[in-house]
Amino acid sequence: MQKKFEDCVKTILEIIGENPNREGLIKTPNRVFKAYEFLTSGYTQNVKEILNDALFESSNNEMVLVRDIEFYSLCEHHLLPFFGRAHVAYIPNKKVVGLSKIPRLVEVFARRLQIQEQLTEQIAQALMENVDAKGVGVVIEARHMCVEMRGVQKANSTTTTSALRGIFLKNEKTREEFFSLINSAKQVRF
């Protein structure tokens, strides 16, 4: 598999007019393989294992928000990076999940070929199903290199997506609290 991948990278280099055997490019196919192996490692990770190992009984029924989770992903259309921050909240239903597992959940889905809309939905759905939360809210703000480097070439533009489940979708006050906490948190830095 690795050799096939590296051969493809060599072919790409040749097609664009480069010499894959020149000094600066000799190890490039291997480097690209390792980079893509890491950037797509989410395909080999199991969401249930990550979350179920860190579920704890709790009487808490208030919103839990982990914000400003930095992520990097690859656009499935152009294989170019998009990156930004995810804000993930849930309301427990007799169980809470370890706080470090929420960024891990974001990473599992971000380290796949993605579109931002799908990434947002997958995070929300996985948290809702695996934690049995009363509700989940996810907002992602990201910059897309396929927009900034090619096509319309609009540098520094951001895309915002949201996914709401359960009480976040049904209850306006819960939804307002979620969006308010995300926005007010932008003003506070430790």
UniProtKB/Swiss-Prot annotation:
Keywords: GTP-binding, Hydrolase, Metal-binding, Nucleotide-binding, One-carbon metabolism, Zinc. Coiled coil: none annotated. The keyword GTP-binding applies. It is an enzyme of class 3 (hydrolase). Its EC number is 3.5.4.16. One of its GO terms (biological process) is one-carbon metabolic process. Pathway: Cofactor biosynthesis; 7,8-dihydroneopterin triphosphate biosynthesis; 7,8-dihydroneopterin triphosphate from GTP: step 1/1. It catalyses: GTP + H2O = 7,8-dihydroneopterin 3'-triphosphate + formate + H(+). GO terms for molecular function: GTP binding; GTP cyclohydrolase I activity; zinc ion binding. Zn(2+) binds at C75, H78, C146. GO terms for cellular component: cytoplasm. It holds the Pfam family GTP_cyclohydroI. Belongs to the GTP cyclohydrolase I family. Homomer. This is GTP cyclohydrolase 1. It comes from Campylobacter jejuni subsp. jejuni serotype O:6 (strain 81116 / NCTC 11828). The gene is folE.
